[in-house]
Amino acid sequence: MDNLNDALEKLKLTGTECTSDKLDGCFDCLLQALGHNNTESSEKIQQSGILQLFASILNSQSSCASKVAHIVAEIAKNELMRIPCVEAGLIPPLVQLLHSKDQEVLLQTGRALGNICYDNHEGRRAVDQEGGAQIVVDHLRSMCTLTDPSSEKLMTVFCGMLMNYSSENDSLQTQLIQMGVIPILVDLLGVHSQNTALTEMCLVAFGNLAELESSKEQFAGTNIAEEIVKLFKKQTEHEKREIIFEVLAPLAENDAIKMQLVEAGLVECLLDVVQQTVNSEKDDDIAELKTSSDLMVLLLLGDESMQKLFEGGKGSVFQRVLSWLPSNNHQLQLAGALAIANFARNDGNCIHMVDSEIVQKLLDLLDRHVEDGNVTVQHAALSALRNLAIPVVNKAKMLSAGVAEEVLKFLRSEMPPVQFKLLGTLRMLIDAQAEAAEQIGKNEKLAERLVEWCEAKDHAGVMGESNRLLSALIRHSKSKDVIRTIVQSGGIKHLVTMATSEHVIMQNEALVALGLIAALELQAAEHDLESAKLVEVLHRLLLDERSAPEIKYNSMVLICAAMGSVPLHKEVQKLAFLDVVSKLRSHENKTVAQQASLTEQKLTVQS
């Protein structure tokens, strides 16, 4: 430490009137002290006031510049010294040094600026004001094809500097993207794939930039997919593959890049990783299995990439994914079910899969998770079944396969995501399937659960789906038994509330179901309809100018049917329905206008 004090005194006395020979010893002493105890030495250097002297030496473009920049780089390793470096005015002369032709000067300057910018807003702002990032980007562009070790080392430092400059700062990352840094980094990855340090730095840079939506288009315009898959194939170490995964996940959110990754052979790589890790109990392998299978599912979210991998149901990838369903590994079961849910995003695929007996594989999987099962697997398998049930030709086949019975086993689930998918699957299955709707609709436990879930205000999705299934059971069965079951379970009030939904489709479904109730079982339901203030709701819907034509039409149909009940008829008479309905006779929609005339006649006759 005495040597450090002596060196600092000597530097203060000499000032900027230095020659390299005279001060080399002092600078070496500072570097040695910083290497031995960075925290203590850097604080001592700052307290001595020598940082301002460094700014003057750097400004003078002295031959000492590279040594001074080196010292600044070491000082800035101490996070407490970064702001003092900015306050001492070191950034402007350091940025000017970026114009140097001397590689050692550029190397130490890049290190100094990178260290000052690390987690330091003031440092970044100062570099931004001096235009430092653009100079570094230009250097990288011009040096990209140089493969000598010193150039590769400098490019690694420059990449690191840009990352420290822009890390977790959207506006600075956007600035780098606008400067065209992405194609440069992709080229660097391609040319220098043998250089571990430089490729890792490029990957870290990609990881930072790929999170930004504005970066995706630029990435899609490069051969990033090809380069990164090529690199992935070479990697055997967990840590290296993990870095690549961190880049792939945000990139794969873009549909164009999804397709590029599929064409570059990423899926085959991921399947290999799954194969290698599936039976391992090591934490690293378990994590890698999850990441690989999750990424596979993400690639299937793109319509084009999904169809390419489906290959008419004959693709090897599709077949491999199917083999995951009977696996004993929950992660693979989950990924397999999610993959099928994604493949089942168009009718053609769904029809092929149902004809290929995939439904039974999903039912077998669900059956393994009925008692204390894995919620994510339940949710994924139900998602797949729901999607498969959408095409009309699949419904009867799936009902025959026992899908409804299997799904109903999960009625006791207390997990909203499972409840939501269960409801959606049943609703899809009974669409235009009168017999199934009647059979399922008479299930008292289901009706009770639906009524309970119709009140799940904390889970809007579950609440909405419960209401829609209640309505669907009535609309598709047109069964008195189903209506009585729903009346006994207390479901009527929820259908009336559903008629006031902000979604027109739900309003209409509720009104059609209520119309059937009034037509088929009015006496059984009249008390509940009166308690739920049905007539008031219908009056409001007809008065509301925002109500869609089909809402007005079905409200009037329901009014006519409801008048068959004495208490409901009295309610109708209390409100000025005639006035409202007569105005609707001139409605621009002919069907509404005709129904208004019929309703007016009925109101007049029965008033």
Swiss-Prot record:
Predominant location: cytoplasm
A GO molecular-function descriptor: small GTPase binding
Tissue/organ expression: Weakly expressed in adult tissues with highest levels found in spleen, kidney, skin and A6 cells.
Subcellular location: Cytoplasm, Cytosol; Endoplasmic reticulum; Mitochondrion
Protein keywords: Cytoplasm, Endoplasmic reticulum, GTPase activation, Mitochondrion, Repeat
InterPro entries given in the database record: ARM-like, ARM-type_fold, Armadillo, RAP1GDS1
PROSITE patterns (alphabetical): ARM_REPEAT
Pfam families to which the protein is assigned, alphabetical: Arm (PF00514)
Placement of ARM repeats on the sequence: 79-118, 170-211, 347-390, 391-431, 479-519
SUPFAM superfamilies hit by this protein: ARM repeat (SSF48371)
GO annotations of cellular component type: cytosol; endoplasmic reticulum; mitochondrion
GO biological process: positive regulation of GTPase activity; small GTPase-mediated signal transduction
Subunit structure: Interacts with ralB. Probably interacts with the post-translationally isoprenylated (geranyl-geranylation) forms of ral proteins. Interacts with both GDP-bound and GTP-bound forms of ralA, but interaction is much stronger with ralA-GDP.
Role summary: Stimulates GDP/GTP exchange reaction of a group of small GTP-binding proteins (G proteins) including Rap1a/Rap1b, RhoA, RhoB and KRas, by stimulating the dissociation of GDP from and the subsequent binding of GTP to each small G protein.
Name of this protein: Rap1 GTPase-GDP dissociation stimulator 1-A
Higher taxonomy: Eukaryota, Metazoa, Chordata, Craniata, Vertebrata
Gene assigned in the entry: rap1gds1-a
